[in-house]
């Protein structure tokens, strides 16, 4: 079983995927990390030197390879992955998808703690971040909502969320 975790930045994908990986003893694959390893560049460097179109094509290629070749893994997706090409359909066809949903307030609080490591918001004024997130969520929610399951992450620990996922999936 491939369990794909998706959601907006700050939704808890990284923390939950690590926790779930340990609980289920499934290897964890972080899609962005895999893209970075295969290109010998950080995601930021790929965007800067090769552009977003190149990145999105690589993202699709690596995603397809993982979904076609792996089994019994936790797959942590980038926040934008489900939005491009037919990625969301592919994710749903080849894995069990779980949308980690958080409120704009929660997402804002979480991403502001790591603002310098979040290229999308690094140059924004703190006061502009909630509106930026709300706009992005409005655009991305139609894709996120196609997930097999949705788990709310507000006020929950990674351990709580992982336990909820295990219960949902009956594993």
Named regions from a protein language model:
Residues 33-92, 117:
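ATP-dependent small-molecule kinase phosphotransfer cores
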């Amino acid at each position: 079983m491939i369990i794909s975790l998706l959601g907006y930045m700050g939704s808890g994908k990284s923390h939950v995927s690590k926790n779930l990986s340990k609980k289920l003893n499934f290897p964890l694959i972080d899609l962005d990390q895999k893209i970075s390893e295969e290109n010998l560049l950080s995601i930021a460097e790929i965007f800067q030197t090769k552009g977003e179109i190149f990145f999105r094509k690589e993202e699709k290629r690596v995603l397809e390879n993982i979904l076609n070749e792996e089994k019994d893994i936790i797959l942590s997706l980038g926040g934008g992955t489900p939005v491009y090409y037919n990625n969301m359909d592919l994710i749903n066809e080849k894995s069990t998808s779980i949308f980690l949903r958080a409120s704009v307030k929660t997402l804002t609080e979480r991403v502001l703690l790591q603002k310098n490591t979040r290229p999308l918001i690094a140059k924004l004024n703190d006061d502009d971040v909630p509106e930026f997130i709300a706009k992005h969520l409005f655009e991305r929610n139609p894709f996120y909502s196609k997930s097999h399951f949705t788990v709310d992450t507000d006020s929950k620990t990674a351990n709580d969320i992982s336990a909820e996922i295990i219960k949902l999936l009956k594993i």
